[in-house]
Swiss-Prot record:
ATP binds at K18, S173, D174. Its main location: cytoplasm. It is an enzyme of class 2 (transferase). The lineage of its organism: Bacteria, Bacillati, Actinomycetota, Actinomycetes, Micrococcales. It comes from Clavibacter sepedonicus. The gene is proB. This is Glutamate 5-kinase.
Length: 259
């Protein structure tokens, strides 16, 4: 049974944390350490944590001397091939401070749609968690086609949350919560709670992602609904507030799960 309300966040036994490209690459690469600090704190109190991390393409771009996200698939795949190894190294370097070992898991949404692939992924994930390791999941951008162009790791995170029967899905971004309209616009109101089945009528959800990522508010709301439908509580907040979020502080937007 998932976490039914905010009150249960601090005691959630199994947590999926999703972080986006713009939060941990480029000038924000330094945010990996505080993200790991928060995950390690949850791990230390007994929680099992899965990290779904975007960022392979964005991390690889400087090594290919690219200032902007490449438009063509082959260059995206090349950037991902370089960036994924650098990204996992950075995570492990930070995790070493806590004696936690990362296990890299590369998936596509299609992998989780095929029953045999899904079963294999589930078995591997359960074993990693049982060994008290940290599965670090990313979309397999080097071989993905449709997903690399139009997919997003928000949806992948929701599917992973369903795969491991997570109590909590924590969706991290550059914005601290869901707002009634783009937060930079006058009159934007922070939404603290979304009841299960709420269609969010009157809420203007922009679809534009960042320059290095593919997600935005639309993908996060869709992912939150997908996870909530399966009984997983979802909290949407900023990467800067990850420690407070995992400690149960009243931050972000809570999506109540199906009861």
């Amino acid at each position: 049974m998932g976490t039914a309300s905010r009150a249960g966040i601090a005691s959630a036994r199994r947590i999926v944390v999703k972080v986006g490209s713009s939060s941990i690459s480029g000038e924000n690469a330094g945010q990996i350490a505080p993200l790991v600090d928060a995950i390690a704190a949850a791990h230390a109190r007994g929680a099992e944590v899965v990290l779904v991390s975007s960022g392979a393409i964005a991390t690889g771009m400087p090594f290919l001397r690219l200032d902007d996200r490449p438009a063509d698939l082959a260059t995206q795949q090349a950037a991902a091939a370089v960036g994924q190894s650098v990204l996992i190294f950075r995570y492990q370097e930070s995790l070493d401070r806590y004696g936690i070992v990362a296990g890299q898991v590369l998936l596509t949404a299609g992998d989780l749609a095929a029953p045999d692939h899904r079963e294999n992924a589930q078995r591997a994930m359960e074993r990693l968690l049982g060994l008290r390791l940290l599965p670090v999941v990313n979309e397999n951008d080097t071989v993905a086609t449709h997903e690399i162009r139009f997919g997003d790791n928000d949806r992948l995170a929701a599917l992973v949350a369903r795969l491991v029967d997570a109590d909590l899905l924590l969706l991290l971004s550059d914005v601290d919560a869901l707002y009634s309209r783009p937060p930079e616009e006058p009159g934007a109101r922070r939404i603290e709670h979304v009841a299960f089945g709420d269609e969010l009528e009157g809420v203007e959800i922009g679809s534009t992602g960042t320059g290095v990522g593919t997600g935005g508010a639309v993908t996060k709301v869709a992912a939150a609904r997908l996870a909530a439908e399966a009984g997983t509580g979802v909290l949407l907040t900023s990467t800067a507030q990850v420690a407070e979020a995992l400690a149960g502080a009243h931050v972000g937007t809570w999506f109540a799960p199906r009861s």
